[in-house]
């Protein structure tokens, strides 16, 4: 499972953005602002909800291996004869703040599949809704992710024809 919300991860997240706000590091400041305690930035919901990319029982990566990807369970569990994909958009709505010690769980469901032929190839848009909840069952965030899964044209000439 995923790790609990903790100060070190919050600090590292903020350091990379060179951003400081007392509610993310100081108990009194967070309480003065109306929170129950130190909170995590809302945009960390996915960070705290995702399990590990690699576990000790997994094989070690070798030179030339494809990089590990974030597990997107529903969209890529749908059987489709597609070889490529890209994310087109994500919408996120935030609700209950994440506090130190919270354990975030993600529940995913497929919303729809819309078949479409685009310049890059024939494929389908798949939309997935992820609901992030804490250990108390409170909704932290809801996101809707759209990914286009497709097969590219057989050859470059066909792709060039589509551009004109």
Per-range role (PLM):
Residues 1-89, 157-164:
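Hot-dog-fold acyl-thioester-processing enzymes
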Residues 87-164:
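HotDog/MaoC-like acyl-thioester-processing domains
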């Amino acid at each position: 499972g995923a790790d609990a919300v903790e100060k070190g991860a919050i600090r590292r997240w903020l350091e990379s953005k060179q951003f400081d706000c007392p509610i993310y590091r100081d108990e009194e400041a967070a309480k003065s602002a109306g929170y129950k305690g130190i909170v995590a930035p809302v945009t960390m919901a996915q960070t705290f909800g995702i399990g590990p990319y690699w576990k000790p029982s997994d094989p070690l990566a070798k030179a030339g291996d494809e990089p590990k990807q974030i597990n997107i369970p529903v969209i890529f569990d749908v059987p489709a004869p597609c070889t490529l994909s890209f994310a087109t958009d994500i919408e996120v709505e935030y609700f209950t703040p994440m506090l130190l010690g919270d354990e975030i769980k993600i529940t995913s469901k497929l919303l729809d599949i819309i078949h479409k032929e685009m310049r890059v190839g024939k494929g389908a848009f798949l939309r997935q809704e992820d609901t992030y909840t804490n250990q108390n069952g409170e909704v932290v965030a809801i996101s809707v992710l759209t990914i286009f899964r497709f097969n590219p044209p057989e050859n470059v000439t066909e792709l060039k024809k589509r551009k004109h």
